[in-house]
Each structure stands twice: as structure tokens, then as C-alpha cells.
Amino acid sequence: MNTDPAWMADVAFDDNGLIPAIAQDAENGQILMVAWMNREALAETAATGRAVYWSRSRQRLWRKGEESGHTQTVHDLRLDCDGDVVLLKVHQEGGIACHTGRASCFFRRLEGPAGSASWVTVDPVLKDPEHIYK
């Protein structure tokens, strides 16, 4: 018996039962991170207002901030036009979304002419990860 909420029928999970989830700062629009959700993670996120993802490496639910304290409170949950990507507009507790101690996981920018371009780190570490994860 399917116990999914009715709205879940509009969500197009991939063959692995996952959907990409973009976390965006609700105040300034900065993209913080991209993760994955399965049905359980999406349902729990919608029910609790706290971001829950699916960790592909650990093969379990990942309640954002469970180890670091850097939780994400969801202010708005959206589904894209094809139903295959979700957008979470969040308040990022502590201002750090990335496991590297930065505000965003998108801290490297491609710089230089096309033939010799390289990735350059452009955003600072706000807190040493050694002091975040114990």
C-alpha cells in the first residue's frame, strides 16, 4: 500500500528513487549546495520544515546539521517545471552549508582564457572543518 502524500505523485524521481535538491539562501538567493532526496527525505522535509537529504555515500538519510549543527530551516519548497528537481529556500544556521567550512559549496570559479583556464578558490573558509566535525 502506497502511503505517500498525494502531492508526491508530481515528483519525478530517477531510476534510483532520487531527485536532485538545490538549497538556496532564502534571504539573498545564494545557491548553497546541491544534494539528493528520496521519497522519505522529501516527505520528512515537508513535514518538519528541516532539510533532510539522502546520502548516497552513506546510504542513509542525512538530516542536514546533525553532526555540524548547521541545520537548514526550509521556508519554501518548490518543484521545477519537469518535476525532476526540487528547490529548497532555506535559512542556513551558522551561515555554513559546505563541509569545507564555507557558506556555499560553490566556492571555486573558472578564471582565465579558455585554453588555460583553471578553478580558483574565491570564497573564504568561515570555520575550520576540524572544529565543526568532532
Curated annotation (Swiss-Prot):
A Pfam family recorded for this sequence: PRA-CH
InterPro entries attached to this UniProt entry: PRA-CH, PRib_AMP_CycHydrolase_dom, PRib_AMP_CycHydrolase_sf
Keywords: Amino-acid biosynthesis, Cytoplasm, Histidine biosynthesis, Hydrolase, Magnesium, Metal-binding, Zinc
Cofactor(s) annotated in UniProt: Mg(2+); Zn(2+)
Binding site for Mg(2+): D80, D82, D84
Record-linked PANTHER family: HISTIDINE BIOSYNTHESIS BIFUNCTIONAL PROTEIN, HISTIDINE BIOSYNTHESIS BIFUNCTIONAL PROTEIN HIS7
Protein name per its UniProtKB record: Phosphoribosyl-AMP cyclohydrolase
